[in-house]
Curated annotation (Swiss-Prot):
Effect caused by changing residue 515 to A: Impairs phosphorylation
Residue numbers of Phosphoserine PTMs: 19, 83, 86, 89, 92, 323, 356, 375, 540
Lineage of source species: Eukaryota, Metazoa, Chordata, Craniata, Vertebrata
SMART domains (UniProt xref): ANK (SM00248)
Gene (name only): KANK2
A GO CC term attached to the entry: cytoplasm
Name recorded for this polypeptide: KN motif and ankyrin repeat domain-containing protein 2
Connected disease: Palmoplantar keratoderma and woolly hair: A disorder characterized by abnormal thickening of the skin on the palms and soles, in association with woolly scalp hair. Affected individuals manifest a variable degree of striate palmoplantar keratoderma, generally more severe on the soles. Leukonychia is more pronounced on the fingernails than toenails. Scalp hair, body hair, eyebrows, and eyelashes are sparse. The fifth toes show variable degrees of pseudoainhum, ranging from external rotation to a deep sulcus at the digitoplantar fold, accompanied by a bulbous appearance of the distal toe.
Function, as annotated: Involved in transcription regulation by sequestering in the cytoplasm nuclear receptor coactivators such as NCOA1, NCOA2 and NCOA3. Involved in regulation of caspase-independent apoptosis by sequestering the proapoptotic factor AIFM1 in mitochondria. Pro-apoptotic stimuli can induce its proteasomal degradation allowing the translocation of AIFM1 to the nucleus to induce apoptosis. Involved in the negative control of vitamin D receptor signaling pathway. Involved in actin stress fibers formation through its interaction with ARHGDIA and the regulation of the Rho signaling pathway.
Residues in coiled coil: 183-234, 282-312
Quaternary structure (record): Interacts (non-phosphorylated form) with NCOA1; NCOA2 AND NCOA3. Interacts with AIFM1. Interacts with ARHGDIA; the interaction is direct and may regulate the interaction of ARHGDIA with RHOA, RAC1 and CDC42. Interacts (via ANK repeats 1-5) with KIF21A (via residues 1146-1167).
Consequence when changing residue 702 to L: 33-fold decrease in binding to KIF21A
Region (Interaction with AIFM1): 1-72
Length: 851
C-alpha cells in the first residue's frame, strides 16, 4: 500500500510557503471527504471500501475517473492532497509505521508524494492516479517550489532513517507509479498472523493460570501431609530399621566364618526337594488315601483267600435232604487235541477258587474230589445247566456245586452255532450234567453230536488233567485264567477252533486247536436264523477292559474279565444221555463298577448336586460303555438285555429311562444300533420297557424308525416288532438333513417289506422332502416297479405333485427311462380322467357328433 509523506511545518525564520488562501477557517468540508475531530480527513471511498471488506464484498470494482470539482474544492497548493490523506490511517499494515504517520491540519505538503511498493490494489491505484492528475494540474504553477525542496529533502532523509524506502524522484515517480511488491505484503501478513497466534497462546495461558493455582495449592497440601506422615514414620520406625540393618550386617560374615552353615543350607535344600515331591492340595491327598485304601482292601481279601486255602477242612456228612438237591456243574469239553476242564466244589464246603500254581497260567486244573468213579458218556452243549436230580444219602458228601469260572469262546467263521459233541470224561462227577461256558456269536440253536473219545492233551494242561483224574489228594487248586478263542480265517472245508489260556499277567501260555469236518458245518447252517449281516468284530474278553477305566493290578483285570464273560454268555439247553428234561437259565451278574456307577447315577438323578463333575463323568462313562457293549452289538442276547432292564427298573424307574435312552458321541442309542443290526428281539425288549424314545434322532438326523429302511425283515416276529415300533413313533417325521421320511428311505433302498409295513400303519405318501420329491418320485427314479404299484394302490396318492424343478412323477419316470412305471402312471391318470365328472357340453354324444 502507498504511504504518505508527511512534511513538517517550517520553523520560524525559515523560508516557507505562505498560508494558502484556499483553506479558510470556516469553509465547509468538501463532500468527498470528512474531517475527524482530531484533524484527520478521511476519504469516503476508502471508508466504503473498508466497509465492503468487513461485509465480504471484495469484488473488483471498475475505476471511474472523477472530474475535479472546482466549485466545491478551492484551487490551491494543498487541494490535491485530499485524497492522499485517506491513506494515513490505513496506509501500512505494519504498526511501526503508524507512529510516523501524523496527518495534522497544518502539515499538508503541497507536492512530492512518497510512493512505496506494495501489492496491487485497485483502490490504491485509483487514488494514486487521482493524485498524479492533480500534480499535473498544478505543475504549471511553479510558486513555492524552491522553498519546499529543502523540507522535502529533510522529510525524505527522516523516512530513510526510520527504515522506510526513499521517495520516488519527482521527475519519474509521478509519471510512472510503482505498485507495492507482493513479497512485502506477504511479509506483513505473516507478521500479523504470527502476532495473532501468539496473542491467542497468551490468552490461553492466561486462562490456565487459575487452574494451575488450584493445582499448586492441592500439591502443596499433599506435600505437607506427606511430610508429616514421613516424620511420624521415621519417629516410630527408626529403631526397627536400625535393628534390621544391624541384623543384616551380622548375617553377612557368618557364611565365610562357619562352614557348618553350608551344611545346614544343604539340609534345607534336601527338605525342599522332598516337599516338592508331595502332592499339592486336599484333593490329591484324598485321591491317594482312596488308592491306598483300595490296595489295603485287596491285600486283606487276598490274605483271607490265602488263609482259606491253607485251611484243610474235613468233609462232613450232611443229613439226607428232604427234597431233591440242585446241582450245578461246569465243564469245558473240546474236540480232539483239546483240554478238558472241570471245576466244582463240594456242597457245604467253603468256596474254592482256581488259583495259580505257577508264575504264568498254563490252563485250568480240574477241581475234583479223590476216589471218584468214571462218569458215563455226557454231551457237550453251549449252556450252563441247572439240573434237579435226586442224590442218595450215602453220596451226599460227594455233591458238588459250581463256582464262578467263566470261559469265553469265539467262532472264527461267524457261524450261527457250533456243533455239539458228546464226550466221556473220567473226572466228571456222577449224577450231574456237564456243560461248557461259551459265548456264541449268532444263534441260540444247538445240534448235539457224538464226540470222539480220542483225546490228545496239550502241554502241561493235559498232564494236570490226568493227575486230577487219578484222584490225587490234598486241597484242589488250579490256575485262574480265562479261556479265549482267537479269530482265524474261515476255511471253506473245515471248521477250526483255537483256544488260548490267558493268565493273570495277560499273556498267552498255551493253546489248542481242533478241526471238524464239513458235515458239522452243514449242521450249523440249519441253525442260522438271526444273523442278517456279516458279524462285526467285537472286543474279546481280554480286550473288554479297554472299554472301561484301567485297573491298578493285573488281578483286578482278570476278575473283571471273568465278570464280563459271565454277563455276556449265551447258552442253549443241553441234552443228556438219559434224556432228562433241563431248564434253560442265563447267568447274569453285574460288575461292581457297573453297580456303583448305577447307584451314583441314581443319586445324581435324585439330586443333581450330589456328585462332583469328576464322579459324574466316571459313572456316566462306565454305564455308557457297559450298556452299549451289552445291548448294541449285533449278537446281543435279548434275554440278557431283559434281565439288565429288570435290574435297572428295580433300582429306579428314572435310572431305567436314563440308561435305555443313553446315547454315544454320535447320538445313537441302543435302539438305533439294534435296528441297524436287524436285531429285532433286542428291539422288542427295548420297546417292552415302555421308556424307549423311538423318535430320538442322532446327529445325522435319523431316528430308529428311519433306520428300519436299512434292515431286512426275515421272520414274522420281526415284522410284528417293526409294526409295534411304527405305531409307537411318528412315521411321517422328516430327517434333519434332506427332509426325507422313513417311507422315502425305504423306497429308495427298495425295502418292499418295510414299505408294506409303513403303508399298513397309514404312512403319508404325499409328503415332500426339501427338494419337493415324494415317495412315488423316488420309486420312479430308482426303477422300483413293485413299490410304485404299492404306492399307486393308495387312494390318497397324488401323482400330480411337482418338485422344485416342476417335474411330476410321470416326467421323472420318463427321464429315468422307466417305461413300465410311466405306463402305470399314464393309466392312473386316464382312470382319474374317466371318473372325473363331465358337464353337458362334454358328454360322449356331443363329442361323437363333433367327430
Amino acid at each position: 500500500m502507498a504511504q504518505v509523506l508527511h512534511v513538517p511545518a517550517p520553523f520560524p525564520g525559515t523560508p516557507g510557503p505562505a498560508s494558502p488562501p484556499a483553506f479558510p477557517a470556516k469553509d465547509p468540508d468538501p463532500p468527498y471527504s470528512v474531517e475527524t475531530p482530531y484533524g484527520y480527513r478521511l476519504d469516503l471511498d476508502f471508508l466504503k471500501y473498508v466497509d465492503d471488506i468487513e461485509k465480504g464484498h471484495t469484488l473488483r470494482r471498475v475505476a471511474v475517473q472523477r472530474r475535479p470539482r472546482l466549485s466545491s474544492l478551492p484551487r490551491g497548493p494543498g487541494s490535491w492532497w485530499t485524497s492522499t490523506e485517506s491513506l494515513c490511517s490505513n496506509a501500512s499494515g505494519d504498526s511501526r509505521h503508524s507512529a510516523y504517520s501524523y496527518c495534522g491540519r497544518g502539515f499538508y505538503p503541497q507536492y512530492g508524494a512518497l510512493e512505496t511498493r506494495g501489492g496491487f490494489n485497485p483502490r490504491v491505484e485509483r487514488t494514486l492516479l487521482d493524485a498524479r492528475r492533480r500534480l499535473e494540474d498544478q505543475a504549471a504553477t511553479p510558486t513555492g517550489l524552491g522553498s519546499l525542496t529543502p523540507s522535502a529533502a529533510g522529510s525524505t532523509a527522516s523516512l530513510v532513517g526510520v527504515g522506510l524506502p526513499p521517495p520516488t524522484p519527482r521527475s519519474s515517480g509521478l509519471s510512472t507509479p510503482v505498485p507495492p511488491s507482493a513479497g512485502h505484503l506477504a511479509h506483513v501478513r505473516e507478521q500479523m498472523a504470527g502476532a495473532l497466534r501468539k496473542l491467542r497462546q497468551l490468552e490461553e495461558q492466561v486462562k490456565l493460570i487459575p487452574v494451575l493455582q488450584v493445582k499448586l495449592s492441592v500439591l502443596q497440601e499433599e506435600k505437607r501431609q506427606l511430610t508429616v506422615q514421613l516424620k511420624s514414620q521415621k519417629f516410630l520406625g527408626h529403631p526397627t530399621a536400625g535393628r534390621g540393618r544391624s541384623e543384616l550386617c551380622l548375617d553377612l560374615p557368618d557364611p565365610p566364618e562357619d562352614p557348618v552353615a553350608l551344611e545346614t543350607r544343604s539340609v534345607g535344600t534336601w527338605v525342599r526337594e522332598r516337599d516338592l515331591g508331595m502332592p499339592d492340595g486336599e484333593a490329591a491327598l484324598a485321591a491317594k488315601v482312596a488308592v491306598l485304601e483300595t490296595q489295603l482292601k485287596k491285600a486283606l481279601q487276598e490274605l483271607q483267600a490265602a488263609q482259606a486255602r491253607q485251611a484243610d477242612p474235613q468233609p462232613q456228612a450232611w443229613p439226607p435232604p428232604d427234597s431233591p438237591v440242585r446241582v450245578d456243574t461246569v465243564r469245558v469239553v473240546e474236540g480232539p487235541r483239546e483240554v478238558e476242564v472241570v471245576a466244582s466244589t463240594a456242597a457245604g464246603a467253603p468256596a474254592q477258587r482256581a488259583q495259580s500254581l505257577e508264575p504264568y497260567g498254563t490252563g485250568l486244573r480240574a477241581l475234583a474230589m479223590p476216589g471218584r468213579p468214571e462218569s458215563p458218556p455226557v454231551f457237550r452243549s453251549q449252556e450252563v445247566v441247572e439240573t434237579m436230580c435226586p442224590v442218595p444219602a450215602a453220596a451226599t458228601s460227594n455233591v458238588h456245586m459250581v463256582k464262578k469260572i467263566s470261559i469265553t469262546e469265539r467262532s472264527c467263521d461267524g457261524a450261527a452255532g457250533l456243533p455239539e459233541v458228546p464226550a466221556e470224561s473220567s473226572s466228571s462227577p456222577p449224577g450231574s450234567e456237564v456243560a461248557s461256558l461259551t459265548q456264541p456269536e449268532k444263534s441260540t440253536g444247538r445240534v448235539p453230536t457224538q464226540e470222539p473219545t480220542h483225546r490228545e492233551p496239550t502241554r502241561q494242561a493235559a498232564s494236570q488233567e490226568s493227575e486230577e483224574a487219578g484222584g490225587t489228594g490234598g486241597p484242589p487248586a488250579g490256575v485262574r485264567s480265562i479261556m479265549k478263542r482267537k479269530e482265524e480265517v474261515a476255511d471253506p472245508t473245515a471248521h477250526r477252533r483255537s483256544l488260548q489260556f490267558v493268565g493273570v499277567n495277560g499273556g498267552y501260555e498255551s493253546s489248542s486247536e481242533d478241526s471238524s469236518t464239513a458235515e458239522n458245518i452243514s449242521d450249523n447252517d440249519s441253525t442260522e436264523n438271526e444273523a442278517p449281516e456279516p458279524r462285526e468284530r467285537v472286543p474279546s474278553v481280554a480286550e473288554a477292559p479297554q472299554l472301561r477305566p484301567a485297573g491298578t493290578a493285573a488281578a483286578k483285570t482278570s476278575r473283571q474279565e471273568c465278570q464280563l464273560s459271565r454277563e455276556s454268555q449265551h447258552i442253549p439247553t443241553a441234552e443228556g444221555a438219559s434224556g432228562s428234561n433241563t431248564e434253560e437259565e442265563i447267568r447274569m451278574e453285574l460288575s461292581p463298577d457297573l453297580i456303583s456307577a448305577c447307584l451314583a447315577l441314581e443319586k445324581y438323578l435324585d439330586n443333581p448336586n450330589a456328585l462332583t463333575e469328576r464322579e459324574l463323568k466316571v459313572a456316566y462313562t462306565t454305564v455308557l460303555q457297559e450298556w452299549l457293549r451289552l445291548a448294541c452289538r449285533s449278537d446281543a442276547h435279548p434275554e440278557l438285555v431283559r434281565r439288565h432292564l429288570v435290574t435297572f427298573r428295580a433300582m429306579s424307574a428314572r435310572l431305567l429311562d436314563y440308561v435305555v435312552n443313553i446315547a454315544d458321541s454320535n447320538g445313537n442309542t441302543a435302539l438305533h444300533y439294534s435296528v441297524s443290526h436287524a436285531n429285532f428281539p433286542v428291539v422288542q425288549q427295548l420297546l417292552d420297557s415302555g421308556v424307549c424314545k423311538v423318535d430320538k434322532q442322532n446327529r445325522a438326523g435319523y431316528s430308529p424308525i428311519m433306520l428300519t429302511a436299512l434292515a431286512t425283515l426275515k421272520t414274522q416276529d420281526d415284522i410284528e416288532t417293526v409294526l409295534q415300533l411304527f405305531r409307537l413313533g411318528n412315521i411321517n417325521a422328516k430327517a434333519s438333513q434332506a427332509g426325507q421320511t422313513a417311507l422315502m428311505l425305504a423306497v429308495s433302498h427298495g425295502r418292499v417289506d418295510v414299505v408294506k409295513a409303513l403303508l399298513a400303519c397309514e404312512a403319508d405318501v404325499n409328503v415332500q422332502d426339501d427338494d419337493g420329491s415324494t415317495a412315488l418320485m423316488c420309486a420312479c427314479e430308482h426303477g422300483h416297479k413293485e413299490i410304485a404299484g404299492l404306492l399307486l394302490a393308495v387312494p390318497s396318492c397324488d401323482i400330480s405333485l411337482t418338485d422344485r424343478d416342476g417335474s411330476t412323477a410321470l416326467m421323472v419316470a420318463l427321464d429315468a427311462g422307466q417305461s413300465e412305471i410311466a405306463s402305470m402312471l399314464y393309466s392312473r391318470m386316464n382312470i382319474k380322467c374317466s371318473f372325473a365328472p363331465m358337464s353337458d357340453d362334454e358328454s360322449p354324444t356331443s363329442s361323437s357328433a363333433e367327430e
